[in-house]
Amino acid sequence: MNSLICKWVRSALLCGIAVVASVGVHAGTPPVFVLNSLDADISVINPETWTETARIPTGKEPHHMYLTPDEKSLVVANALADTLTFVDPRTAQVQRTVRGIVDPYHLRFSPDMKWLVVAANRLNHVDFYRWDGQNLTLAQRVATGKTPSHLWVDSQSRTVYSTMQDSDELVAIDIATQKIKWRIKTGAMPADVYGSSDDKQLFVGLTGSDSVEVFDVSGTEPRSVQRIKTGAGAHAFRATGDGKHLFVSNRVANTISKIDMHTRQVVDAYPAPGGPDCMDVSPDGRWIYVTARWARKLLVIDTQERKVAHKVSVGKSPHGVWTLQHAAR
């Protein structure tokens, strides 16, 4: 990728989208929520009619969201507001706003339900908050290096992995000690990170390149073992419910690639115009819901027909996406 495209991709990295039940949606049908980063709100979308039915105000620059372990709240991270907005995933009503969460860009709950981990993208640290099911208490702030971007927590709640967007690194943080275990160089502009079900491999989207980099993290020292060419601006991941395939959005190429997790080969690709970013997937794996960052759209992609089936107008710079009716995570 030439330097002009790299600069363009860097300037466009801020984004967010999600899917849940909400106001204006037929009873029993979980809606789609899309985070409009530059409008500071959430688009609520009816998946029966594929129309926007409501807007929910948030703090400034909502980018990513995550469901609480009890599935009672969708937590939206508002990076420039230093807040979290808790939304009922079934009624789309705002439950509360938690203040004093510094620069929350990306977030993950640990599988053991004890921790909320937050990447402070602009301030170069990852924060650990104790979670008791209701309250958040800052336990540790870990200085990571330049621009921590996306997070992944292993299935045993032992390790947090964070990509370093501007220093081209992958960092592992021990949850027990909340100290950095190791760091390793990656390709250009690492963004999303996804772990295999056995916790032995990590897939990293190289947004400044055209590839997904695969790391073996099964031993004491990590190793880069492969680069899978997918398309320019490889960025975000979402797996099918059976864990056999991994979708990656290629933001500059305007495509979504499908990777076989066993062979680590691209087996299919789909058109996704407008700068595809975050994704969610239907339970049967047929439908991909993806934000088009530069087109102010939510795209619904039919993987059987290999085409865009629906385009829904949303707000400015749509980023995160979530739905209660999705493939198992």
What function would you assign to each model-found segment?
Residues 2-13:
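Bacterial N-terminal signal peptides that target proteins for export
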Residues 18, 22-329:
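Predominantly soluble domains enriched in secretory-pathway, periplasmic, or organellar proteins
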